[in-house]
Amino acid sequence: MSRRCELSGKAVMSGNNVSHANRKTRRRFLPNLCQVTLISDALGRQFSLRVSAHALRSVEHNGGLDPFLLKASDAQLSSRALKLKRAIEKVQAVAA
């Protein structure tokens, strides 16, 4: 399981710890990932996703999982989230 957010694409970054004496040692910046269960209103199902805290706030800000996925670009979504987005689009096209 990679340390990458399934909705926002946030991943591990690398950089330096810099001491007061300006010595640099390598370090990793890990994303704040949470295992959450989100509900799709269009599909009427629950989905367990590994999401960063930043993406979770964005989902709530957009009004839920469905509006967030429909607004999100395909490049930043994982393959599971992209399949979910396509399924939501298909259900909404049939309902319209």
UniProtKB/Swiss-Prot annotation:
GO terms for cellular component: cytosolic large ribosomal subunit. It comes from Parvibaculum lavamentivorans (strain DS-1 / DSM 13023 / NCIMB 13966). GO terms for molecular function: structural constituent of ribosome. The gene is rpmB. HAMAP family: Ribosomal_bL28. This is Large ribosomal subunit protein bL28. Transmembrane segments: none annotated. SUPFAM superfamilies: L28p-like (SSF143800). It comes from the Bacteria. It holds the Pfam family Ribosomal_L28. Belongs to the bacterial ribosomal protein bL28 family. Keywords: Ribonucleoprotein, Ribosomal protein. GO terms for biological process: translation.
